[in-house]
């Protein structure tokens, strides 16, 4: 509770709180995502940061934080998809464990761990496999919340274009979207068919709390193209 209070105070003091009058377009997007997924409206902030990112923090009263670069880089639909993804974390009650996973990801950086007292404890946690298991769970949680975003947007290409901008940065405007999707399918095919490719992909992703953007595109395409997405909609009468 104390930590959650600190998080809220930090962003109230250093970021812009989104309200019906302050950034009303973002507030409207949050309303759409929350109403669709059946989640009580959390507080949302926009923080000055050049990294295209967003995250959800807190537990009992979670907050969503959008980096300013994300709001500037993405169009309205893509921004809604990101907000829906974050609301998906709240709906699925991921926030506590995601916070722990991000902390472990941070501490796994050797240069950071060397500066922190008790780094031997960090090494012990890692050796016990706790870190690997939690980060693996976090990556699956991210994929499940991409599906939450899909349920809000009902258009896999909005998710795909968002991932393209995450992968390509400012260069994304020069990237052919259809070829990017083809790359995602090729990645998934190689991952499924080649043990060596699967090994290297898993090794490279093992220390991260998020799957690679291409991986996320491949997963959302598979979910929609195999009919699983339609089954979820039908089950909920959509």
Predicted regions and their residues:
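Cytosolic-facing loops and C-terminal tails of multi-pass membrane proteins
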Residues: 1-8, 147, 151, 155-238
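Hydrophobic or amphipathic, alpha-helical segments that drive membrane association/targeting
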Residues: 1-57, 131-134, 170-171, 193-201, ...
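Short helix/loop segments within enzyme catalytic domains
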Residues: 14, 21-27, 33-39, 116-190
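Active-site His/Glu-centered metal-binding helix of metallohydrolases
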Residues: 74, 83-92, 144, 148
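Residue-level signature of catalytic and energy-coupling elements of molecular machines
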Residues: 30, 66, 145, 212
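Short pre-active-site segment immediately N-terminal to the catalytic Zn-binding motif
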Residues: 21, 65-81, 133-139
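Catalytic Zn2+-binding segment of zinc metalloproteases
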Residues: 87-106, 113-115
């Amino acid at each position: 509770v104390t930590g959650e209070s600190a998080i809220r105070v930090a962003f109230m003091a250093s970021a812009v709180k989104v309200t019906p009058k302050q950034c009303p377009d973002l507030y409207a997007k949050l309303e759409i995502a929350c109403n669709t997924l059946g989640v009580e409206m959390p507080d949302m902030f926009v923080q000055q940061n050049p990294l295209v990112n967003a995250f959800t923090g807190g537990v009992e009263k979670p907050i969503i934080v959008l980096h300013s670069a994300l709001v500037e880089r993405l169009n309205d639909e893509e921004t809604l998809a990101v907000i829906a993804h974050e609301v998906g974390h709240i709906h699925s009650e991921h926030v506590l464990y995601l916070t722990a996973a991000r902390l472990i990801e941070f501490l796994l950086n050797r240069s950071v761990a060397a500066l922190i007292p008790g780094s031997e404890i960090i090494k012990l946690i890692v050796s016990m496999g706790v870190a690997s298991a939690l980060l693996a769970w976090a990556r699956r949680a991210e994929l499940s919340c991409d599906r939450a975003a899909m349920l809000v947007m009902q258009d896999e290409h909005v998710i795909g274009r968002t991932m393209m901008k995450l992968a390509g940065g400012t260069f994304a405007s020069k990237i052919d979207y259809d070829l990017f999707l083809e790359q995602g399918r090729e990645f998934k095919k190689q991952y499924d068919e080649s043990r060596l490719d699967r090994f290297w992909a898993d090794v490279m992703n093992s220390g991260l709390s998020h799957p690679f953007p291409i991986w996320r595109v491949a997963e959302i395409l598979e979910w929609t193209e195999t009919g699983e997405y339609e089954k979820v909609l039908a089950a909920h009468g959509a």
